Amino acid sequence: METHKTSLVILFLILIFAVIHSGGAALRIKAESFMGPRLWRLCFVSFSLPSAIVLISYFLAHRYDGIRLWNFQGNNFVFLLVWFLTAISFLFLYPATYNLLEIPSVLKPKVRIYGTGIMRITRHPQAFGQIIWCFAHTLWIGTSFTLITSCGLILHHLFAIWHGDKRLAIRFGEEFDNFKKNTSIIPILAILEGRQEFKIAEFFRLSQFGILIAIGVLWWSHQYINIAVKTFNSSFLSEFFN
């Protein structure tokens, strides 16, 4: 049991993260009508961002905990595969970068139905981006802690698929029904069935270039992971969770 203590903690942190994100999404319509979209976005970020930072920090500090299931580190093919999958996952994970100024509420945040770009491949790109990311990093790290973390994150995103469709159906009605008919949850399925077409030109936009820059920055920043881990381990948060 002691071997998997940190795995239980990370599952608890994922649960908190999921409640904040999915709960915040469920409350959005009522909250925006009460306090306005900008103030609600700032309130939401003030809770979601710290929860994400704590979750990521704890994961980095304990990623090699538990049982070592396999070890492909040192294998150049696996190394390249992991970085390729990570890059692909970012293209799925961050469709929100299409409206960067809405994130800090510089522009008025607004719920939209996107029917272009990555949405032609799957209408839930963040879920499949997370699945790809989890597969890549579990393959590379190879510990039971990372495997359990990945399972927790994937379960959260599978719930978000159902929850997201339900919220959009309530909010947009017939418009979402038409969108649903022309898209698929499973990547590429709608294209293969002829309900959708792939347009490569829609991927050549400034936001996608920003994602490529982010991937490069992340590659560079991996050398500082140990510094981040030492900082977290010396903080009151590490003592609290221990």
Map each language-model feature to its residues.
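Membrane-interface interhelical loops and short amphipathic "cap" helices
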Residues: 1, 65-73
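A generic, lipid-embedded transmembrane alpha helix
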Residues: 42-62
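Membrane-helix interface motif
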Residues: 56-65, 225-233
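Hydrophobic transmembrane alpha-helical segments in integral membrane proteins
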Residues: 1-18
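Cytosolic-biased juxtamembrane loops and peripheral soluble domains of multi-pass membrane proteins
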Residues: 32-35, 71-219, 223-241
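Membrane-interface helix-loop junction between the first two transmembrane segments
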Residues: 20-40
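Transmembrane helix-loop junctions and nearby membrane-interface residues
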Residues: 22-25, 56-63, 94-101, 138
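Hydrophobic alpha-helical membrane-associated segments
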Residues: 16-19, 23, 156, 160
